[in-house]
Amino acid sequence: MGASASVLTGSKLDAWEQIRLKPGSKKKYRLKHLVWASRELERFACNPELLETAEGNEKLLQQLEPALKTGSDSLQSLWNAIVVLWCVHNRYKIGDTQQAIQKLKEVMGSRKSADAAKEDTSARQAGQNYPIVSNAQGQMVHQAISPRTLNAWVKAVEEKAFNPEIIPMFMALSEGAISYDINTMLNAIGGHQGALQVLKEVINEEAVEWDRTHPPPVGPLPPGQIREPTGSDIAGTTSTQQEQIHWTTRPNQPIPVGDIYRKWIVLGLNKMVKMYSPVSILDIKQGPKEPFRDYVDRFYKTLRAEQATQEVKNWMTETLLVQNANPDCKQILKSLGPGATLEEMMVACQGVGGPTHKARVLAEAMATAQQDLKGGYTAVFMQRGQNPIRKGTIKCFNCGKEGHIARNCRAPRKKGCWKCGQEGHQMKDCRNGKQFFRQILASGGHEARQLCAETSTPISPTDGGGSEGTGESGTERGPERALSVCLPQIPLWDRPIVTARVGGHLCEVLLDTGADDTVLNNIQLEGKWKPKMIGGIGGFIKVKEYDNVTVEIEGREVQGTVLVGPTPVNIIGRNILTGLGCTLNFPISPIAPVPVKLKPGMDGPKVKQWPLSKEKIEALTAICQEMEQEGKISRIGPENPYNTPIFAIKKKDGTKWRKLVDFRELNKRTQEFWEVQLGIPHPGGLKQKQSVTVLDVGDAYFSCPLDPDFRKYTAFTIPSVNNETPGIRYQYNVLPQGWKGSPAIFQSSMTKILDPFRRDNPELEICQYMDDLYVGSDLPLTEHRKRIELLREHLYQWGFTTPDKKHQKEPPFLWMGYELHPDKWTVQSIQLPNKDVWTVNDIQKLIGKLNWASQIYQGIRVRELCKLIRGTKSLTEVVPLSREAELELEENRERLKQPVHGVYYQPDKDLWVNIQKQGGEQWTYQIYQEEHKNLKTGKYTRQKASHTNDIRQLAEVIQKVSQESIIIWGKLPKFKLPVTRETWETWWADYWQATWIPEWEFVSTPPLIKLWYRLESEPIMGAETYYVDGAANRETKLGKAGYVTEQGKQKIIKLDETTNQKAELMAILLALQDSKETVNIVTDSQYALGVISSQPTQSESPIVQQIIEELTKKEQVYLTWVPAHKGIGGNEKIDKLVSKDIRRVLFLEGIDQAQEDHEKYHSNWKALASEFGLPPVVAKEIIASCPKCHIKGEAIHGQVDCSPEVWQIDCTHMEGKIIIVAVHVASGFIEAEVIPAETGQETAYFLLKLAARWPVKVIHTDNGPNFTSTTMKAACWWANIQHEFGIPYNPQSQGVVEAMNKELKSIIQQVRDQAEHLRTAVQMAVFVHNFKRKGGIGGYTAGERIIDILASQIQTTELQKQILKXHKFRVYYRDSRDPIWKGPAQLLWKGEGAVVIQDKGDIKVVPRRKAKIIREYGKQMAGTDSMASGQTESE
């Protein structure tokens, strides 16, 4: 008592005894109250010595205050006494307990206000990274952003990757910044172009909204007054630093442009965070054993990513935080009341539910409880094993001793299998007759997934999946077999709460394997009880202990000890669960099967099994029995009608057999899959790492379950010799080898499994391709290998094993056909075979090896070898090696003798590419960062066009290398090319649309390539002009080619087995052969012009090769094109000469010939109508469908869709403004206007205006964010417009609108001085282009052309309706000399005075007065001058 009484002495003790317990009460505090308080504090595990000082009292009050709302009256009295004692220590004059409590609230409130004010002041002083400061002259100047702040921002973006943390990080770093500083921060993260584009859209939309709500004042500004900021001024694009400072700091109505801009950025960041972190706040729930602190961290991290107002976020915090907590924490949080702060919640829920908290409370209870209760605890613990129902003994799988299980074993963990003792596998994989012990239930010996036939749990690869049990387990249990046929399974996805009957009372209980005792609340049990105190959630509780209480759960009864007391949750502990025979089961391979279906309308394969030899049958039987034991396949009965044939081949060693299944028929019928990994990783793209490990996943496919509904389609049959017994039928439970879906499903499953490990171990670089894993890191070797073991354990938990024999720890590492060393890599050793006789299959394998070696060995060539196997040949056909192929093969052998190595990628250095031409149209290239240290090499021999030249092939090589670089390293290299800038630009000026190439700088490296001849761009003065032409008959293959000159010279030759194209080229060859050193050649063939004008230097066509040889002999050649049938003298003359006796024309039946003729000559509609006897509207439609007769500026090679209702739309920029341009592809008609922002809303509004003026069915745009926005999709859906996008790397797909952009800008520059605003100049330029500039076929303007095209389309549509209608009629007619009616004939055309009919293959023209037209209603009789039906001709 002396220690307790020493809390107060002297005057303080006198003051203590003067304070009343309650206002107006006669009772006062005495010394005994201090003694009582000291003992109570010991009960709550608090130090009584803290009562001696005011600071100690404050600590006690802070510790006890959270429990007041749920505490007992005794706790409230203790807290009141400590409050009074605190006032006495501080010498506050109080009269009773109520005044003491009031005094405490006042003091604590004033402290909080002072602390908050202090924090606010310090935050204002230290929070602004870029304050606007006043200089010595009193002017407000800007303090520039510091590199340290900028570096912190860049590092945050790279590490957080737009997670919710990036928003408070941005707000902290940009505190006090103006728009200029914020734009500097955004420019520093320019590598994230996709995210910045989203941010740009938000800024544009907010700027437009600002301009709408803050219109500029009308009229000029007063002198000396600075304008009000617009939306673009706030964004910093059209304002200066001084203006931003003035708007922020001006005394009258300041506008904090920096803060406004920060709000816009935060809106954009919220949008990006939502994209990068798509988890909803509703999905954040606390796990059963998750600490409350971790749950709160996840909750607020996701809350920051929610795009909601602050009021909504406050509501989420008040409701969802409590609602989604686990039941243990939720019970405590609800007891705190609705006004609890986050601090109070975290203090109250600290350690709740975790095993650490329970262990600490239990230890304190055992240390402080009275001695007579210790026996009670001992009795509780000794209750295990005393249950009369429990049979058998517990045996440890680790040490082999009885009395405990392996989890509680104190002996060292035994390596290897717990059953047979061998290393290399675990007990679950042991094949010595028993299954994994975790899958055996204590009460029946059945596997966990075989307990109940109604379970829907997916079958693991190690489970047989059938319903047959082993005979061993059946005989071992005896009578209990009937009780365990179908035991209940309780999953742990949610809290395991069941209904139990305890002492005859029904109640909801929680099955808690972490609790020793069974504790219930609000239940009256019969019999004697004894008092007991146990440690629980929130402290100690007093309970009543009943013995031998009957507990019934799921139909099974057990008697045991039950405690009754004020527990928040009814708990069934291990003392009852053990008696019930309840066990925890861990299923292997929890991978969810991927749903798979057959193609619509198809059924499974039903292919008969072909005969097999006896040794193959025996081998397949043994293999399938082993697979069945491992659960990979299951036996099936005759109810499955499907079958796939199987066979067996010997492995490479020649001793073991391998089972193969012919899944070709099933693959045809299975749905299509998307390959989630389109290529293999390349070692040149790996970064050099200090530690490297290579792993291989064993039985990769057989570790992934197959969709249970699809398994029946994988059925196969093992036949018997001489059909002695029915065949044994099986189906697959796992992914089969050879099935088309196995690679995609395995890759997808493997990626999902590795994702959490990648997130938890960012230091590791994991490259995954199928079952091969490369793991590299810069960690020390010991730490790296620890991480590897964690990875192997992680994979093992999901059912994937990593065999030790394929676990490579030391270099060199064999991976994906490569050999990896610490500082270099190469391909694995390649041996080229020496053969006297080569087959097609041998050549194919040889070319594959050489192509594989070419990625690191320079100069590998295979062109001559590829020539050997051209055409359709059998794989076993013998191929003699040509002299060139033998020489090429020997050169490759010599190159492969010298070892060559590549190096690893260094991100901080630039990529360079060297390209060389090897001769024979073969190219090689090397990609490197340092000279003579190649990352990758390669070759190029493919020829996309039949006629090409070195410049065009070089462009194709650049394109190939660029795409490889983007795939492997994610960026473009710099090129060193064997060409001069002048040679390149000479060809590229006209052929810029032939292919895509990236931006690159010219570094010419010898030997240089060049153009061997050049076509002149203007006619050659004084040179003779040759008009050339050719014609061929498609049926007879006969043709003519020739030329005429303006001097009267002409030459015509006859051709056999030719085509129109060959005849046209032969005519040009004749002109070149017969002309002098300089010549002008005129052709009407677009095909011939396209071939020759691309200046090829080699060609697969013999005629083109001869033309190239003739061109190299000439000094100057001018080649041009004119349209056919335009009355051009020389062209018309040669056309008649070569067409004589060649062409044949039929009316209407000759539409195909007319289209072919137009593709060749591009004649106008009048010429087509005259030559082929077509109606004008039909001839005009042929013209309208030809892109070359309407489009100006299109690429020389390639065409675009020129249907009458197709438009191309694009955005271009001029004078800092955005111009949106729409071009009618078929006519070149333009619609354009200036838009305020390049957003989806503005683009969609422009599209709707366009659709309101013209018929628009299809639009073609690029992949810009404004065109791919949801607003644009909605506009296209509403207007029923099909939206097509451009092809990446192919600007020709947007060639029409790109050319029109250039022309429109040219016209704008011509009329710009006539307009004050750009938008006015744009409309003036559109008017000039559409109605003041003529050109093209017929000399139309674009406006006239679009009207003519649309009118012709309407006429053609009506004409087609008439033609289809006319085909429904039959005609009876008579000749002038024969009065007998003939027919019926088919009606082809009905004119004003005559009809065209077809009778028995002959086409005739009959006057209307001698023809009777009737509808075909079946067999009808025709009378003289009368119709067989009442239908008139007008119908």
Swiss-Prot record:
Q: Which residues form a coiled coil?
A: none
Q: Which residues are annotated with the lipid modification N-myristoyl glycine?
A: G2
Could you confirm whether the keyword Disulfide bond appears in this record? no
In chain numbering, where does the motif Nuclear export signal fall? Answer: 16-22
Instruction: Give the region (Interaction with Gp41) as residue ranges.
Output: 7-31
Specify where the region named Dimerization of protease lies, as residue ranges: 488-492, 536-542, 575-587
Residue ranges for the region (Dimerization/Multimerization of capsid protein p24) are 276-362
Q: Which residues carry this modification: Phosphotyrosine?
A: Y130
Location of the active site: D512 (for protease activity)
Q: Record's Gene Ontology CC terms? A: host cell; host cell nucleus; host cell plasma membrane; host multivesicular body; membrane; viral nucleocapsid; virion membrane
Location of the Integrase catalytic domain: 1200-1350
Q: Where is this site: Cis/trans isomerization of proline peptide bond?
A: G219, P220
Keyword annotations of the record: Activation of host caspases by virus, AIDS, Aspartyl protease, Capsid protein, DNA integration, DNA recombination, DNA-binding, DNA-directed DNA polymerase, Endonuclease, Eukaryotic host gene expression shutoff by virus, Eukaryotic host translation shutoff by virus, Host cell membrane, Host cytoplasm, Host endosome, Host gene expression shutoff by virus, Host membrane, Host nucleus, Host-virus interaction, Hydrolase, Lipid-binding, Lipoprotein, Magnesium, Membrane, Metal-binding, Modulation of host cell apoptosis by virus, Multifunctional enzyme, Myristate, Nuclease, Nucleotidyltransferase, Phosphoprotein, Protease, Repeat, RNA-binding, RNA-directed DNA polymerase, Transferase, Viral genome integration, Viral nucleoprotein, Viral penetration into host nucleus, Viral release from host cell, Virion, Virion maturation, Virus entry into host cell, Zinc, Zinc-finger
Q: Which residues bind Mg(2+) 1?
A: D696, D771, D772
Q: Tell me which residue ranges form Integrase-type zinc fingers.
A: 1149-1190
How, per the record, is the cofactor bound?
Binds 2 magnesium ions for reverse transcriptase polymerase activity. Binds 2 magnesium ions for ribonuclease H (RNase H) activity. Substrate-binding is a precondition for magnesium binding.
- Please tell me which stretches of this chain the record labels as motif Nuclear localization signal: 26-32
Residues in domain Reverse transcriptase? 630-820
> Where do the annotations place Mg(2+) 3 binding?
D1210, D1262, E1298
Does the keyword field hold Disulfide bond?
A: no
Something else the entry says is: HIV-1 lineages are divided in three main groups, M (for Major), O (for Outlier), and N (for New, or Non-M, Non-O). The vast majority of strains found worldwide belong to the group M. Group O seems to be endemic to and largely confined to Cameroon and neighboring countries in West Central Africa, where these viruses represent a small minority of HIV-1 strains. The group N is represented by a limited number of isolates from Cameroonian persons. The group M is further subdivided in 9 clades or subtypes (A to D, F to H, J and K).
Q: What is this protein called?
A: Gag-Pol polyprotein
